[in-house]
Amino acid sequence: MKKLFLFLLISLFFSFSCKKDIIIVEAYYTNWFGGVKEVRGKDFMMVIDKETSKNLQIKHFLINDKKFNVEVEEKGNTIEIKSRISEGIDKEIELKNPIEKNSFGIEYYNTKTNKTKIFKLKKLQYKPRSNQQEKFS
């Protein structure tokens, strides 16, 4: 009986200590091309679970260690975090190159712990735009 109680106590401790601030539903980027010749960029999107993220204030996207402003929108049980980056305009990021591994994430403030944290993804998925055919020259 003591062993069972000890096991349950340890399991409970680990479940609280390993609780994540963010549960990602989806994270991806798409290419976009503007109406003006040679204007292009990327849209970045991260969808996170609303319930586990209720104490968070999303501050920035981190892309190749540079900070970019975000739009945050609640939709049902999720929170959408978006950013549109224009090549050559926004901090002169080189968007023709792929996003480096482990270099995409978000910076957020946790109101419960009063700490700013960074959450990084190992890989960011590319998703072609459905309403726009992409042409590469």
Model-predicted regions and their roles:
Residues 18-137:
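Non-catalytic macromolecular-recognition regions in eukaryotic signaling proteins
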Residues 1-23:
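Bacterial Sec-dependent N-terminal signal peptides
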